[in-house]
Amino acid sequence: MLNRAMENSDMKRNSSTLLDLPVVKSSLVVEAIHMSRKKLGWYNESRRDSETVKARVEAGLSEVKKSVEELALLIKRSNRSAGFQEKDMEVLKMEEKYAEVMRVLEVVKEEVSRVKLDVSSVLIERVAAEEKVEELRFKTEGGLRLLESLKKEIEVANEEHLMVALGKIEALKGYKEIERQREGKAIKVLDLLVERNKRIKNMLEEAERSKDIEIELFETSTDVEMLETQLKLFKKMERRVQGRDSSSMSRSNRSFGRGKYSLSVLKEVTEGKKEELASVKVEIFRVMTVMDALRNEIIRARDETACLGKILREDDVKIEKLNSKILIEKSKLEVVSIAEERISSLAENFVGSLEKIKKSRNAAKKEEFLFKEEKTVTKAETQKTKLDIDKKESELNSKLDELEKVKHTEALVLEKLESLVEDMMESREMESEHCSTITISRFEYEYLSKHASQAEETAEKKVAAAAAWVEALKASTKSFLMKTETLMRESEMTKAEEEREVFRMERSLSTKRLVEGEIQKIKRNSEAEGYISPKPVGKFTPVQRGKPRRYSSVGTPTFFVIKKKKKVPRLAKFFSRRS
């Protein structure tokens, strides 16, 4: 049985090492640790019970051994005794003792078989506890792998957060550079517009002066034309007046001289006006060239203002795009910061749970080491008990053989005694026919009186023992009922704790799924293109799940109720009392 149980445990351990267990949560690991601790307690209790049963069996075997030795001594005494009636009584006692010894041997065999069953059940429980320890080890490794994956996800989220912050800084730098360029271009455009306005004002002033000059030129030209007409009229009059007299000639000469002088003055004035007109024409030509240049400058300024307007509009579009990108990055940054805070809180929780798992792992290692030591000790003890049981069985078999031989001899002696008793009975019947009294020996009289008193005492003692046994049975039933009630309460409490642990595990799984979903959304939003209007990020609501059904847990303890057996009677005292 023990070898098979050990082989099964080795096979299960090898199969468990070959399996790849999935990643589990810390709450499952803690629950498994609690269950393993409970099973360790149950194993220790069952081991203590098996040790007590073993001690009882050893005590019973020692008592049986003593009783067998006493029987052997009594057999020797019976063989050595010389009295025939004493041999008869001792033979009867030996038969009773033999029957009692056989009953005791049957009880001892039952106890030994029960001890073997208890040892096999304890070994099976120990194998199950070792399997639980292996499962705990794999679960702790899975928790460590989960923590490493969470750390990697946190590092990736931190890198994304840094990338978003760097993109925000670069966008702000570009925005500032564009604003600076825009301000510089606006200042240049304003300077150009001021210069052009000044030029336009100067050109308008020159145009007004040219208009004044044109007006003066027109007036001078009208004066010149009038003088020319007057000169023509004067020449006509001079031709008419040539045929008149000398008196009139002198007057005309004088008037002619005056007209000539005025004509010369007019000529000089006209020449000056002509020069002024030429200079005015030159000035007008220069003004026209300047006006053409101003027109060209105005056209070029209009083109430049249109280009600057386009550039400003493009800059406005770029600034709007940058503002939208900044808003998007801000929203992403807020989402990433919220996710990072949640991941950091989860990481702290997982770090705490990992520390608990490490502590429980160390405790499990210590318990495993203690299990191994206890395993070796129990192996040695079981081997010793097996050897002792085999030795005691061989001794019992030898004693039984001796008892069979003694029984055979006693049967022969009984036959002889029966023949003698029949002879005595016949002789006494023959004597009783002649007289009303029967003569018996003093030994027979004393034996019968003692036997009657001892029978009364034994009957009274048996009645008292039966009453005490009934009381003890009632007390044991009460204690058993109390134990069953406490065990039922403990089982209900353990079921409630298991349900709470399952609920916590599902809640932690839902939060982890939500966090993973948010991280995936952030990744998809960062990869997606186009403008996304920033919206306030709401709180994450945990997913409500249905309450788990109450199933009977696989790890419910199996309680071994060891009934109180009747104590092996001390045969030496019984025989001494009977004798």
UniProtKB/Swiss-Prot annotation:
Family membership: Belongs to the WEB family.
InterPro entries: Web (IPR008545)
Protein name: Protein PLASTID MOVEMENT IMPAIRED 15
Keyword Zinc: no
Positions in coiled-coil regions: 90-161, 188-216, 383-419, 481-501
Keywords: Coiled coil
BP-aspect Gene Ontology terms: chloroplast avoidance movement; response to blue light
Protein function: Required for the chloroplast avoidance response under high intensity blue light. This avoidance response consists in the relocation of chloroplasts on the anticlinal side of exposed cells.
Naturally occurring in which organism (per UniProt): Arabidopsis thaliana
